[in-house]
């Protein structure tokens, strides 16, 4: 496919964690703190929900389900864990979709960010690392996360110590995710005497995600209580 392989391989990078971190940091420190916090909530709570669903559904990647599917090598390197729902689409929706929400009155920015979300989702299908349902479900979940976090942050700001409630809830859910990751049963399928997908490799994504989420919310609560960065 030539140029399209190259182009969409770069587009899909906009749904990776590094781009998310850089964007959140830039917006938080330089553009607008409240907008940065909104993006951070979208990203971290979005990947928390996404990971719960991934290890619950345990759906294999397309090339595992059908040997006729051959993704590009570069895309496969970042396609870790189970397939459903799409993590890249979740990240793209949380960051670029979040920016579309915050800059809704600017039509150019709004539609540019929305198009970027859709392009990342399409790139996951084009590069053959996700099925359409992986992308669509992740997109729908992401929209609910965008809406829910607007309500959640508004609720936090209108009451005393509600930030502690949210922080405690996040710690509890993270602990549940780790316990669930360790204790649940995972499918083990064989082909020609070999394990198709090693469950241990599929579950490793839970741990760094939990550590990132705890670290981010710890920084958030410390800022609210002691630093109050303007």
Describe every region a protein language model picked out:
Residues 1-6:
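Short, strongly hydrophobic alpha-helical membrane anchors
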Residues 7, 23-24, 28-30, 47, ...:
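Membrane-embedded catalytic cores of phosphoryl/pyrophosphoryl-handling enzymes
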Residues 12-13, 37-42, 82-88:
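Short secondary-structure transition/capping motifs
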Residues 10-22:
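The first (N-terminal) embedded transmembrane alpha-helix
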Residues 30-63:
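Membrane helical hairpin/interfacial module
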